Amino acid sequence: PDEIPTPELLININLKKKFGIFMQKMFCYKLNIYNQHESPWEGTRITRKKNLNSIDFLRQKILAKNLKYSILRFDKERSIEIFNNGGWHFNYLLKPEAISNKLKTFAHTEFNNEKYTDLEKIKDNINNLKDLFNRGNKFQKVNIDESFPRYIIQNKEEYKEWII
């Protein structure tokens, strides 16, 4: 899994509503390439078993934007609790070859072409902190600090290949 919820939130969880969303920092390609354009990411969801219709329901219908709708919108679930600083989402934490292969088998077939799957372009995007999909997003390198998962902090040497 590429989403890691904040352990302290899980340990002390006291869900007051039917559903919860962990708002997570998103990183791309490496552990410390921060994607500020898609942060906070609506990552890990939580609910009680009695409220779980399906995993797809949690992913597709339990959204933070639901809280902005009028209470007259009965079609939108509004019993949602937001947990800020809810963890980390590590997206495309793969070697360039694996990213290329992933894009070639991606459900969005429009990304299965050389414009996106070329190894040199992927490496260039990683080295220049650019978005794979040419959406104009520029990412930023951040230092591994106390805001990261404790395991990563304690094992930086083991993960040096994944830190720039």
Q: What is the meaning of each model-derived region?
A:
Residues 2:
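Conserved "landmark" site that anchors the functional core of diverse proteins
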Residues 75-164:
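C-terminal accessory extensions appended to soluble enzyme cores
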Residues 5-115:
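Conserved catalytic core of nucleotide-sugar-dependent glycosyltransferases
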